[in-house]
Amino acid sequence: MAGRQPVAIVFDTFGTVVDWRSSLIAELTAFGRKRDINADWTALVDAWRAAYHPSMDRVRKGEQPWTTLDGLHRASLDKLVAEFGIKGLSETDLRHINLGWHRLNPWPDSVPGLTRLKRKFIIGPLSNGNVSLLLNMAKHAGIPWDMIFGSDLFGHFKPDPETYLGVAKLLDLEPGQVMMAAAHNNDLANARKQGLMTAFFARPSEYGPHQKRDYAADQAWDVVAKDIEDLATQLGA
């Protein structure tokens, strides 16, 4: 990449760094088999993710008090378990299932690419996940973050400006010294509005057969890469 380079690179996490869909489907399918609970776990995972943005929007609009993503995930799970007619789950079971979001697996290029980038840049997630979720995920997946920027540090979810600008403030950097990396064009558009640099790489299988967008960059982002390892190469890491 010619020209200016960032001091820090922050990454969207769900879908960008980790494969939430395949991870949860595999874990819940194994859980159901072990417990002899028959359910359409794939459909449940897709419905659970579909509840993600609407639940956060209720918080962002002030329709409900600040709630961590763990809390929002749990409220959505409770509703879906009832809707899917899944019986026999204890509170311990429900908590275990909800914490599946803490045990997501990385895409194959994520850890190698981040390890390279870490040698040259400050790296961390800028995610709607809470700090404990992202910390546990990093431990599970071996993700080598320098710092974890969870939504509960800011009391805001993306795309609120407080998230993007909050990273720069915490790192004592100007927004233009921070790069937002994501597999979602809308995330990058919101980051760019706040003055951040941007990097895009596609995750065309994030939503499985339900993927409808983000197959390619839809703007001239500062960097367009194949994946995180290619991002590292383009940034000279």
Regions found by a protein language model. Give the residues of each.
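Secondary-structure boundary/capping signal
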Residues: 36-39, 85-88, 121, 125, ...
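Short phosphate-binding/catalytic loops that engage adenosine nucleotides
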Residues: 107, 119-122, 196
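A short, Lys/Arg-enriched amphipathic alpha-helix followed by its capping loop at the start of a domain
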Residues: 31, 35, 113-121
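A short, structure-level motif marking secondary-structure boundaries and short turns
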Residues: 14, 61-63, 97-99, 119, ...
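N-terminal helical cap/lid subdomain that shapes the substrate entry/recognition surface
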Residues: 3-108
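Alpha-helix boundary recognition
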Residues: 49, 102, 115-118, 236
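Asp-based, Mg2+/Mn2+-dependent phosphohydrolase catalytic module
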Residues: 1-9, 111, 115, 126-237
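A generic structural signal for short
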Residues: 65-66, 101-102, 123, 152-153, ...
